[in-house]
Amino acid sequence: MKKYYATHLVKSEDLNHHGTLFAARTASWFVESAFIAAACEHGDPSEIVCRNMHGMSFRTPVRNGSVVRFTSRVVHTGSTSLMVHVEVSDELTGQLAVDGYLTFVTVYKETGEKHPHGIVLDEPEDAHEVAEREGAQRLRAGL
């Protein structure tokens, strides 16, 4: 599936008391990035709601002045759900800082009831996408 990107400059107001990127700020950008992927694949943002954040794992601290890239793509589809994998990396070094999965559901905007989206996954582009999809399957097996 297509990758979607969002880039942010980490500023002093984004930091916690340790001088690294605050988890709540990261979570906000993380969900927004995943939402963009789900909404663009579905085609109507008003019909997408977040159901579950399956985890947001910090791999390395993100410091003030860092430029971070959020890379998101749909890695699993159910009849009404879309699971998105998000990776946050340092734009300058490429080092992975954070990753995780979120699930979104398609709903009728008038009633909020779930409805099928009709999205079908394409063939994975590479081994990395295969691994992301396998991670989604492991999460789903544990639900």
Predicted segments with their positions:
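Catalytic strand-loop segment that frames the active site of acyl-thioester-processing enzymes
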Residues: 1-23, 127-143
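Generic structural detector for well-ordered beta-strands
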Residues: 7-10, 57, 103-105
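Hydrophobic beta-strand-centered segment that forms part of the acyl-chain substrate-binding groove
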Residues: 21, 35-71, 75-82, 95-101
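Active-site-proximal betaalpha loop/short-helix elements
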Residues: 30
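HotDog/MaoC-like acyl-thioester-processing domains
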Residues: 63-64, 75-143
